[in-house]
Amino acid sequence: MPTAYKRVLLKLSGEALMGDDAFGINRATIERMVADVAEVVRLGTQLAVVIGGGNIFRGVAGGAAGMDRATADYMGMLATMMNALALQDAMRHAGIEARVQSALRMDQVVEPYIRPRAIRQLEEGKVVIFAAGTGNPFFTTDTAAALRGSEIGAEVVLKATKVDGVYSADPKKDPSATRYTTISFDEAIGRNLQVMDATAFALCRDQKLPIRVFSIVKPGALKRIVQGEDEGTLVHV
């Protein structure tokens, strides 16, 4: 069956790996996510992943607690490295070939980020996991997703969250909140909808790189998106 996308960038938050736990990596949760990824890989869509680290350490929180913000952000990057290795390991157990490329060098453990190599690995059918954000403090992993997505020529950034799209208001607080099927970047800015942080959002808008926000908790959602079905919210130019 033909797919809607040839190459996609999946943004996974660190918190998504926790499942119902308060901290760390929930093995059952990561295995379920990998099963979803496996379905997409089998369809022939090239998949890259940018992973966060908030389940282990958040640079913003460290900065707020009195730690030097740059130091806290570097600690957050190391947290993403741990998540990337866990994800790669789970993929290996599921029979998926995956490579981790890091914006911070840790040569004994992972490959450094090299754009042509990443593209070649995607073309070979491997999943490429980008770790350590952009490699610079003060930039979120959402911004890393926008950056890497632009660099590798992804057709869409798939932002995996615990909510099934972008809503007019917080659905947990406002029962009348409605989900947008599609919305433009300018509309989202005008309505002050928090899809991504401002830097990431601006980069996607400038590069005309659409964002699809969807629920990673919803079974089969990732596969349905790749097959072109209506899932979550599409943010477009």
Swiss-Prot record:
Example of a GO cellular component annotation carried by this entry: cytosol
Binding site for ATP: K11, L12, S13, G14, G54, R58, T161, Y167, D170
Enzyme Commission number(s) from the entry: 2.7.4.22
Pathway: Pyrimidine metabolism; CTP biosynthesis via de novo pathway; UDP from UMP (UMPK route): step 1/1
Gene Ontology MF, one: ATP binding
Top-level taxon of origin: Bacteria
Oligomeric form and interacting partners: Homohexamer.
Protein name: Uridylate kinase
Organism the protein comes from: Paraburkholderia xenovorans (strain LB400)
Gene: pyrH
